[in-house]
């Protein structure tokens, strides 16, 4: 960071789909002092996280945050068949999606911006990069740069749109990604 003149306290991690899963896992590992983050400089923290259709996979029934996470912006469609929107648990493991994470952040009084799109599929892994730049700019300006202690939730619904399937099994999530 020093060599390139980068202020490491202003790094925002962003990812889409598997990349969103990666950045969310990175922040979760930092918050829980996981051995996976030992190679990072002492005290390193992200300034913010932007996740387009991401989730956290955890060997346990709940996510447990040992410290307050960076401000997060979470985009997700509630009919995503690739990455869970809310949570799916099976055999003592959980796959925790954006809705679930947003609920935890609200309970923790941690700054976040959750943008939920009704009846939207995994298209939310890419669409907001074009369609929601103003919302992303607002998140970066208010929650990251100005450090405003805000919890923002936006629910986008298309009037008259037909309902689509929203309940998927773990096997269906796996099949949609690997088969």
PLM region descriptions:
Residues 4, 16-18, 81, 97, ...:
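Gram-negative outer-membrane beta-barrel domains
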Residues 8-11, 72, 111-113:
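Hydrophobic anchor at the start of a short beta-strand
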Residues 21-25, 45, 97-100, 131, ...:
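Extracytoplasmic/secreted proteins, especially bacterial periplasmic and envelope-associated proteins
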Residues 106-179:
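C-terminal catalytic histidine-bearing segment of alpha/beta-hydrolase fold enzymes
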